[in-house]
């Protein structure tokens, strides 16, 4: 899911009936929605600041739950995209570990209309250098290239469900 409110509406009752369901938050997460995100999601793929990381850690502590975290890297250094600059990733990794987050990997969305291969390769190298186990990259249009660079999570919803209206 990429919207907290939609996930809460769609999945709260379903998750109560089936505790094995694992939900992934893949969209931008605002700090005012963290409480609900931590309650419903098992994975958050879009952490991009100390402020957001701290808020997640605080909410997890309140309800005694651990959410698996990916840091979102703005790998193409695009001003219009969310994500931390690749040069600042190591500091945020250390901070997340220091405050007790279950940081498992990095996530990126490369620039559109550009061959993503170099970006995926760079993300794979960065992920390995930080000794993280998971890599969230690749969408319906480029997931095969992402898999070549060891992506462990791909976002292919539009291939399955069609484009959002």
Question: Which sequence ranges carry the predicted segments?
Answer:
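Active-site-proximal glycine-rich helix-loop-beta segment
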Residues: 150-152, 157
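Conserved alpha/beta-domain cores
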Residues: 1-133, 139-141, 147-149
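Short Ser/Thr-rich beta->loop micro-motif in glycosyltransferases that lines
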Residues: 138, 158
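Expand to "…catalyze enediolate/carbanion chemistry for C-C bond making/breaking, isomerization
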Residues: 160-165
């Amino acid at each position: 899911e990429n919207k907290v409110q939609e996930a809460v509406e769609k999945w709260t009752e379903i998750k109560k009936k089936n505790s094995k369901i694992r939900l992934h938050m893949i969209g931008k997460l605002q700090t005012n929605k963290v409480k609900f995100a931590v309650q419903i999601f098992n994975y958050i793929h879009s952490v991009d600041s100390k402020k957001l990381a701290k808020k997640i850690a605080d909410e997890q502590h309140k309800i005694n739950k651990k959410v698996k975290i990916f840091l979102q890297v703005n790998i193409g250094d695009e001003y219009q995209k969310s994500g931390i600059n690749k040069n600042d990733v190591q500091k945020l990794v250390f901070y997340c570990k220091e405050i007790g987050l279950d940081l498992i990997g990095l996530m990126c969305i490369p620039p559109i209309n550009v061959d993503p291969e170099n970006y995926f390769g760079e993300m794979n190298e960065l992920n390995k250098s930080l000794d993280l186990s998971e890599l969230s990259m690749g969408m319906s249009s480029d997931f095969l290239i992402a898999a070549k660079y060891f992506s462990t999570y791909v976002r292919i919803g539009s291939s399955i469900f069609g484009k959002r209206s």
